[in-house]
């Protein structure tokens, strides 16, 4: 018996990985975070599967349900939204399972920041503009930010910021970023990226407040950075005609001759 932790993706049911879909179809028990995982994914569960919405459950109750399935020799599909490597609360579940000697594995999912960038049609790391993306959030009731992990510190790098779980303190976010990025820095807020009812707001740090209109909910992602709206960037050397690379050796003495490892 194995517990399969599966990243369900950002929202659209067809953005789950093939592996994730197949694991769901193979498990007689499915636990899903109903507040963020689309119910359409449950159609992949086998007939007669036990399907449990964990949104109203405590960690103890979730682990008890998994342990019950383990005792019955049943595999479990554990669905979380987005990708499990960030803000999934997977770590505490894995720690409990290790203590109980219950085996598990992890299948990654499409993260929300990637879905938001796709919605915008944006490459976040444009040569000469930005080569780093910082995934962060502000302090909330569930988790405080460690000392040093502040918006001001991250903003000093000039990297693209993907700020999660923070649209409810948008005034504070803008106030902290303007001194480092400037009022003309592009911003995009993407609410429920890839869902049928997704919403997108494009603005600058100076105009963001007046561009919002109706209040967006907590699931909105804030993207900040120059690469969101510029045509002034370098072309990658990767595809330059004079660039000697392993799969396209050039000249009489290429850096990577054909057949070399």
UniProtKB/Swiss-Prot annotation:
Phylogenetic lineage: Bacteria, Pseudomonadati, Pseudomonadota, Alphaproteobacteria, Rhodobacterales
NCBIfam families hit by this protein: cobM_cbiF (TIGR01465)
Pathway named in the protein's UniProt entry: Cofactor biosynthesis; adenosylcobalamin biosynthesis; cob(II)yrinate a,c-diamide from precorrin-2 (aerobic route): step 4/10
Reaction(s) the record says it catalyses: precorrin-4 + S-adenosyl-L-methionine = precorrin-5 + S-adenosyl-L-homocysteine
One Pfam family per UniProt: TP_methylase
GO-annotated molecular function: precorrin-4 C11-methyltransferase activity
InterPro entries: 4pyrrol_Mease, 4pyrrol_Methylase_sf, 4pyrrole_Mease_sub1, 4pyrrole_Mease_sub2, Cbl_synth_CobM/CibF, Siro_Cobalamin_biosynth, Uropor_MeTrfase_CS
Catalytic activity, EC: 2.1.1.133
Gene: cobM
Assigned protein family: Belongs to the precorrin methyltransferase family.
Protein name from the UniProt record: Precorrin-4 C(11)-methyltransferase
